[in-house]
Amino acid sequence: MCMGSQGDCQPFIALALALQAKGARVRLYAPAEMEELCATFVAPLARPLIDFFGMPHLSVKKLLESDPVVRDAMSRGNFFKFMQGVSQPNYLDMTLSDADLVLSDLLNHFPADHIVYNTLFAAQGATAAEVLNVSSTLVSMQMTGSPSAFEPCLLISPKLFRKLPFFLRRATWHAFSLLMIYAPIFRDTKWRVKKLGLRPLSTSQKMDIWLGNAAGCSLIIARSPLLSPAPRDWPAAERKRVLGAFILSAQEQVKAWPPSVELRAFLDAADPPVYIGWGSMVAISPLHMLTLALRVLKSLGKRGVILAGWAKLSANLLDESIASDVEELRSYLAENVLIIESNAPHEWLFPQCAAIVHHGGAGTTASALRSGIPSVITPCFVDQPELAEKVNRLGVGIGLNQFHSVTVKQLASALSTVLTDQAMRSRAAILGEKLCAEDGAAIAASDILLRLNTINATSFDEQSVKRPGAARVGVQPAVGAA
């Protein structure tokens, strides 16, 4: 079960395919708007379709488009205001309506032997596992394990985090966890008690669910240990749970998202371009994002490929500009820049670029690092500043301050550095080779199935495997929402 943007859900497609390749039957529960993405990725490939169940009510994209509070919070990188925006009653109602549909499907049509869910659907995934009396796995794209004094908390900037004494560093993680368990995704008392007849979750139970410590649950961190090694103050067992990013290969992405004739021609026409893409982020305004990108490219005389993203960047936005250089930007765009409206196969595109400018989302960062091409990160909020700092520390790119404060001069300077610093480019290439040797989705799939088979070899099979309609565990296990 996965909730969120494409960046939150796409890794679960990779995991679903990896589980399917190992003989598991899989049903993916995700926002209905991801159905086309799922079908697009899988249909052209020589393998069975993923069994997809679309959750129709909650859409992060629609929430961003329709709610000015949420949109402004993202624009300014204000996490607290963002949480305030998504704490509205209608957000909770939509979440629980989708959760109810998922649970009904699990009970009546797909009696899974194991439930896998992401952090944005943690309470609902854990409840589904509780009702079905099966084991579960929490997959996190962030380092949301035990409180650590060595892993920057997502609540504050990494720079501020490292200035704090150790006990306060851990305290920020406790505060972050408390903030999350009082978010709408955990306010499900009405659903659990009135609809399902379960006891309400206590604070300690919510905390266990959030940290992946709930009964019968295991935690997987979908990050490369080369990028995010487990903090040394995590428990020994937890340090082994950083398994690698869940990535669809370049071949899979190209078959799913065939590069357009225009993109191929643009890449072949001259020197490698600079890629600029901010994914699902909308910062300040789409016009600001576009003019920032164009002014930086123009100042350096570089060609660029710009991803339209959720901000819907396009040349038409320049019609809204009253800036004195708007005609120069329009001309530069027409001659030197290609804006791609649809999703781009990052694993194929990034290695053909001279540099990569992006927002620091977990999936984009993983693909950028795997490409061996240095990047500039302009983070907005949540885990993006932390990933920007990690890229800085590895010396394979430059992480800037939050997007809303980045100037043309700052971004141009950073981009110039990653384009010309040969030592940095060499480090990026070496790291990229190492990361490409990893297969986090396959490792995670093996881990999940091994654990499921181990459970079935013990007393667990007497409790849950014998329920009516259960799949044969260990032969062809049914994994729900992987």
Across the structure, where does each feature detected by a protein language model lie?
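A donor-sugar binding/catalytic signature common to diverse glycosyltransferases
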Residues: 8, 117, 342-389
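Donor nucleotide-activated moiety binding/catalytic core segment of transferases
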Residues: 305, 309, 315-359, 363-364
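Conserved beta-strand positions in the Rossmann-like core of class I SAM-dependent methyltransferases
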Residues: 27, 305, 376
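Hydrophobic/aromatic ligand-binding patch that stacks against planar heteroaromatic rings
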Residues: 18, 37, 127-128, 296, ...
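Nucleotide-sugar-dependent glycosyltransferase catalytic domains
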Residues: 32-303, 315-332, 426, 430-433, ...
